[in-house]
């Protein structure tokens, strides 16, 4: 069982058995407020220094497919590598549709991921290598706003930690693919800095499962 599946199963059990119910967007959910988890590099114990491209190819081959998780192989690969497909995205800040890749690499014309790398190249011990996705001038007027709000890259002992904050996260439908996307991002940044990616420091305000997914999610923990 890979790290993404083990974390997914653990958190699904906690959320489904918590009996903490809420109604979100007119849909019942079960949720946990204030979740903090460490999601390790899936190759942490490997003698090989696997880079982001090798990780993506493993995703594409199905090495990280998870039973009962609806997104697999090619679809996972496309999502994970969306950071490298920015030229295929319409770069229009006034459009309704956004992607994390767009907000991170074209936030009002600014490439925040490039800024992170340059900041850490100047000072590897910096706590200032931060990128945001929320745009108050646009998102306060929209129903659909980014779930992932902030990332921070920290280098400690020649290893990169990616600290992330989600305002809201669909545990059953999105958590594994989100973690693979962020692992790819962490590996990509680490590769540019010539350090090893260590882990994701995950923070989420509302981690939840929608009522429509209860039945399928329950199969995961049976």
PLM features per residue range, with description:
Residues 1-222:
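Terminal, non-catalytic protein-protein interaction segments that mediate quaternary/complex assembly
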């Amino acid at each position: 069982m890979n790290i993404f599946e083990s974390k997914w199963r653990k958190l699904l059990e906690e959320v489904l058995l918590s009996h903490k119910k809420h109604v979100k967007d007119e849909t019942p959910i079960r949720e946990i407020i204030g979740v903090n988890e460490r999601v390790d590099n899936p190759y942490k114990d490997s003698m090989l220094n696997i880079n982001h491209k090798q990780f993506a190819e493993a995703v594409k081959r199905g090495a990280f497919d998870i039973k009962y998780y609806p997104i697999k192989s090619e679809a996972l690969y496309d999502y994970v590598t969306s950071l490298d497909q920015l030229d295929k995205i319409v770069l229009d800040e006034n459009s309704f549709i956004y992607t994390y890749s767009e907000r991170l690499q074209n936030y009002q014309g600014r490439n925040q991921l490039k800024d992170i790398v340059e900041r850490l190249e100047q000072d590897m011990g910096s706590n200032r290598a931060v990128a945001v996705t929320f745009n108050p001038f646009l998102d306060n007027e929209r129903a659909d706003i980014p779930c992932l709000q902030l990332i921070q890259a920290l280098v400690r002992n020649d290893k990169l930690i990616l600290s992330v904050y989600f305002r809201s996260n669909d545990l059953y439908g999105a958590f594994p693919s989100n973690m693979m996307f962020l692992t790819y991002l962490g590996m990509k940044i680490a590769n540019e800095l010539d350090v090893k990616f260590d882990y994701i420091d995950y923070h989420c305000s509302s981690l939840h499962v929608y009522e429509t997914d209860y039945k399928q999610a329950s199969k995961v923990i049976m």
